[in-house]
């Protein structure tokens, strides 16, 4: 079945790319415009339709954990982008410019998005380049829209952001090709009843070449019975190969629900099978720990003022790095967040969290503590 899906995806990509060559201009346009004129028009359209911008998220944080640094100031994110549309092709180039170059987690300045998508049909759009993996609700969401100061643990650890397997920080992205579309538009309000995504990725994360012949197959489907509500399912069959040549599986599935309307409700569960690179015991040529992990979260929030500038959110966020050990590795975060939109492109966010970390307590450190942070978001 997996080989069949791969073949179908490649065939669809080839078909759409070929079709795009004929869809760029009609026969009448082709007869009236020379190739040079058509090319010049496309370039002008690209220049006119390209927008440039960026955003910055600054953060001041504090905690009461024993043995930890109790306060900090940092630039959480600084990103610049150029995006637009030319004919039927949308494109996006985004860079993250904060961080320390050459850091172990590769958190320095880097390209995060570099993709182009053919969007002639709403039911079949083909995207190629470096982009978000088609896995989970939160992963493709902009940091401005999460409602909290960071993504959930499940999203961070199991969608390729700071992945548990040992992959470098990739912000949920990889290099690949994806087919997606919207099906069955509602006669009442026009929203699509079905959204699907399926793609092949290298499995090595952003800005890295492929290191094995296996391509990660990732896909999902969302059902939207009413506007604003979606029920979603995803699957991921992949492998990651480290710089030292250790290969680990990433076999994962997830299910989630999201509602955006008068209030916001979002929840997801994700299960993963596959060891970490660090789990390999070279001396004994055996794996240690457990190959299974899981995470889940539930969040809800709503505007509390008539102008909707002040919004309050609450969440429960749990992640188990290893399942079926003789002790618990579950880390649970109970959080509340308040954000105030000062202007359209300027907001202030306060996040308060109570953390219960069983794995940290097992190591003899303080695993029950509180954190607070104040974040300032601005766009330009």
Residue ranges and their predicted role:
Residues 14-18, 89, 280, 363:
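Hydrophobic alpha-helical membrane context
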């Amino acid at each position: 079945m997996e080989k069949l899906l791969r073949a179908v995806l490649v065939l669809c990509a080839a078909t759409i790319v070929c079709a795009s060559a004929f869809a760029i201009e009609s026969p009448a346009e082709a007869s009236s415009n020379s190739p040079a004129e058509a090319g010049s028009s496309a370039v002008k359209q690209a220049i006119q339709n390209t927008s440039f911008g960026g955003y910055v998220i600054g953060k001041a944080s504090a905690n009461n954990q024993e043995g930890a640094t109790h306060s900090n100031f940092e630039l959480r994110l600084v990103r610049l982008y150029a995006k637009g549309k030319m004919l039927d092709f949308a494109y996006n180039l985004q860079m993250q410019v904060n961080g320390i170059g050459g850091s172990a987690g590769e958190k320095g300045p880097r390209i995060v998005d570099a993709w182009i998508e053919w969007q002639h049909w709403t039911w079949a759009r083909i995207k190629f380049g470096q982009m978000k993996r088609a896995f989970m609700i939160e992963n493709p969401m902009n940091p401005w829209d999460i409602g909290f100061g960071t993504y959930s643990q499940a999203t961070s650890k199991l969608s390729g952001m700071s992945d548990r397997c040992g992959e470098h920080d990739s912000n949920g992205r990889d290099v690949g090709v994806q087919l997606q579309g919207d099906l069955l538009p509602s006669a009442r309000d026009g929203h699509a009843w079905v959204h699907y995504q399926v793609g092949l990725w290298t499995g090595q994360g952003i800005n890295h070449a492929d290191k094995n012949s296996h391509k990660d197959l990732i896909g999902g489907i969302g059902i939207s019975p009413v506007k604003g509500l979606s029920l979603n399912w995803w699957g991921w069959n992949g492998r990651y190969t480290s710089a030292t040549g250790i290969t680990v599986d990433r076999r994962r599935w997830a299910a989630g629900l999201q509602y955006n309307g008068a209030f916001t409700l979002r929840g997801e569960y994700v299960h993963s099978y596959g060891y970490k690179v660090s789990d390999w015991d070279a001396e004994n040529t055996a794996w240690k720990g457990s190959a299974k992990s899981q995470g889940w979260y539930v969040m809800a929030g709503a505007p509390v003022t008539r102008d909707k500038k002040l919004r309050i959110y609450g969440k429960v966020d749990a992640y188990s790095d290893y399942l079926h050990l003789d002790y618990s590795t579950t880390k649970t975060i109970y959080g509340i967040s308040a954000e105030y939109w000062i202007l359209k492109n300027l907001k202030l966010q306060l996040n308060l969290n109570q953390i219960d970390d069983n794995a940290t307590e097992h190591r003899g450190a303080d695993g029950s503590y509180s954190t607070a942070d104040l974040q300032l978001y601005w766009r330009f």
